[in-house]
Amino acid sequence: MEGWQRAFVLHSRPWSETSLMLDVFTEESGRVRLVAKGARSKRSTLKGALQPFTPLLLRFGGRGEVKTLRSAEAVSLALPLSGITLYSGLYINELLSRVLEYETRFSELFFDYLHCIQSLAGATGTPEPALRRFELALLGHLGYGVNFTYCAGSGEPVDDTMTYRYREEKGFIASVVIDNKTFTGRQLKALNAREFPDADTLRAAKRFTRMALKPYLGGKPLKSRELFRQFMPKRTVKTHYE
């Protein structure tokens, strides 16, 4: 793939004394691993551009799993993330690195990612609605199809006041037992609309996406979540990540 592509750096690490190993998310090729030769040298013009949350145009090539970066241009300055929104951005970057296979095209997801980063950059309140929408979009692109609006058992539309439990490969069925794996019809409608007007629907969305993403993430904890707990105030951590 030698043409220019829109891209974002998800993660980078040193690779030899003068080069970087990049994990990037591109519009056409999906997630790609690149070597940026000379990017760490003092004279490199790429060093400042190859950072997370900077919209890029990249050109790369090669036949192996690890491609070689040919050229890179920053489309604009990095989107301004700091504090909670920075850790939120690191979280979705790590999420993509953990669940996406290399060189699988996800063009629509690329724009979902861009929209999420833009929403985080412009957030004046909690970043959680943007995170939940992105997680739901990611699940959809991974093939995790869920019907939030109908009871799988009866075929009837979900009722706001009833409780439902999710069964894999079946959907939501009515439940008389209420626990952390059940959802009200009102919460399911909010998930379907991807609109979370209050704390109740936001908490429900977080419960569902964590449950749904768990098989993709396995038992390995997310580093971004641990960093958030380590560096942000305890009250903030509990509000946004517990």
Curated annotation (Swiss-Prot):
InterPro entries, alphabetized: ARFGAP/RecO, DNA_rep/recomb_RecO_N, NA-bd_OB-fold, RecO, RecO_C
Domain of life of the native organism: Bacteria
Instruction: Tell me the keywords, alphabetical order.
Output: DNA damage, DNA recombination, DNA repair
User: Which Gene Ontology BP terms does the record give?
Assistant: DNA recombination; double-strand break repair
Extract one GO cellular component term from the record: bacterial nucleoid
Q: Quaternary arrangement and interactors, per the entry?
A: Monomer.
Family membership noted in the UniProt record: Belongs to the RecO family.
> What is the purpose of this protein?
Involved in DNA repair and RecF pathway recombination.
Name of protein:
DNA repair protein RecO
Give the originating organism. Answer: Shigella boydii serotype 18 (strain CDC 3083-94 / BS512)
- Encoded by which gene? recO
